[in-house]
């Protein structure tokens, strides 16, 4: 019998395994992944102030790229922010986990049932453990009302250097389509870029062929000559408007959860790495790793996060439900004009009361009446439950 089985080899469970291996190298754990490698095909990014110095230290071997700042671009605002920005690639992530866990990673392994102390594989085999953590990604739930962040990114090698020294996190000078749209660009080397077309949309419908064309068009508009496509990634992330966190957890009683499965992501940006790191630390610090204490720990962690993020869900309702779709960029342009510490605390999910007042006061970027109606539009019974 294993001490711990982690079902799903994505970011959250991978970081839990990585941290536990650092802290407790003799722990008998197993990571089960349905795909061909842990981490799938993704790029996870985060801001310098999202993590503590200690967290930066234990995560450092996984970081593939680091920059001293980043830029944002809007029709009436162009700004460079001077705080660090970092990215982990799924290739680096998988390599590190294989080195740390060895044969304790099972790939191409489908699971049919997850219980607090056991896992049943698709072939019928049953595995027992002191605890099981379900980290198989986001699942559709009637307990949540969401918008969506849709994206397609392509990693291109260029014919010549691109000249970028820092990422462009948002270029919203592009034509606005399907809600709020921007292009996200990471300079991975002197002649390699990850270019990602992103839309905040009301429905989870993504036209990949159209997005491939817009990525190509954007590169050409910048004078970047594309030589070789090295990789492509796609995604559809939930952007939470309102919901009931207790109902979200009710469909699998007693089973500890992690990551998107637990509702652990930034409600507005969709970033999930900072919370995955924090949960990994909390689990590694726990004196007991049985199913009951881990269920209590992970559920309480998720519920605390939910209660703290009500302001972000309010902002999301204003972004998705107020004003014309083609003008939603104005909300983000106004936000990025705020003082840099406020922007960094926003990404870290640690806004002060003064920060919240800064965001809500001043000339509204969407019609005031519509903004307040959207802010008060709760789901499903006009109570945003914590």
UniProtKB/Swiss-Prot annotation:
Pathway of action: Carotenoid biosynthesis; beta-carotene biosynthesis
Top EC class, one word: isomerase
InterPro entries per the UniProt record, alphabetical: CrtY (IPR008461), FAD/NAD-bd_sf (IPR036188), Lycopene_cyclase_b/e (IPR010108)
EC number, as in UniProt: 5.5.1.19
Cofactor: FAD
General function of this protein: Catalyzes the double cyclization reaction which converts lycopene to beta-carotene.
Protein family (similarity comment): Belongs to the lycopene cyclase family.
Protein name per its UniProtKB record: Lycopene beta-cyclase
Classification of source organism: Bacteria, Pseudomonadati, Pseudomonadota, Gammaproteobacteria, Enterobacterales
């Amino acid at each position: 019998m294993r001490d711990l089985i982690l079902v799903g080899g994505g970011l959250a469970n991978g970081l839990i395994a990585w941290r536990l291996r650092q802290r407790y190298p003799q722990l008998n754990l197993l990571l089960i992944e349905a795909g061909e490698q842990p981490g799938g095909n993704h790029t996870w990014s985060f801001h310098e102030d999202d993590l503590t110095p200690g967290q930066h230290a234990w995560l450092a071997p996984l970081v593939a790229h680091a920059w001293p700042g980043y830029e944002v671009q809007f029709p009436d605002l162009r700004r460079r922010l001077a705080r660090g920005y970092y990215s982990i690639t799924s290739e680096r992530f998988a390599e590190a986990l294989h080195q740390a866990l060895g044969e304790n990673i099972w790939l191409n392994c489908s699971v049919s049932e997850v219980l607090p102390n056991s896992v049943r594989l698709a072939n019928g085999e049953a595995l027992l453990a002191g605890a099981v953590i379900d980290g198989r990604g986001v699942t559709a739930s009637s307990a949540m009302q969401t918008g969506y962040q849709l994206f397609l990114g392509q990693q291109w090698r260029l014919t010549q250097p691109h000249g970028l020294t820092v990422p462009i996190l948002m270029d919203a000078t592009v034509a606005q389509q399907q809600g709020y749209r921007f292009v996200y660009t990471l300079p991975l080397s002197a002649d390699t870029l990850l270019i990602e077309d992103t839309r905040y949309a009301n429905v989870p419908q993504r036209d990949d062929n159209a997005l491939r064309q817009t990525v190509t068009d954007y590169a050409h508009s910048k004078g970047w000559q594309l030589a070789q496509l090295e990789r492509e990634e796609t995604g559809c992330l939930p952007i939470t408007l309102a919901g009931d966190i207790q109902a979200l957890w009710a469909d699998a009683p007693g089973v500890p959860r992690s990551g998107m499965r637990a509702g652990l992501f930034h409600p507005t940006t969709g970033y999930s790495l900072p919370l995955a790191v924090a949960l990994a630390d909390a689990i590694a610090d726990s004196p007991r790793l049985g199913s009951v204490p881990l269920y209590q720990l992970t559920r309480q962690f998720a519920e605390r996060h939910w209660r703290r993020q009500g302001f972000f869900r309010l902002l999301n309702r204003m972004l998705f439900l107020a004003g014309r779709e083609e003008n939603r960029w104005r909300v983000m342009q106004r936000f990025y004009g705020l003082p840099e510490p406020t922007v960094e605390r926003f990404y870290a999910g640690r806004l002060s009361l003064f920060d919240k007042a800064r965001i809500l006061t001043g000339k509204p970027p969407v019609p005031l009446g519509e903004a307040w109606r959207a802010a008060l539009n709760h789901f499903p019974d006009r109570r945003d439950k914590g």
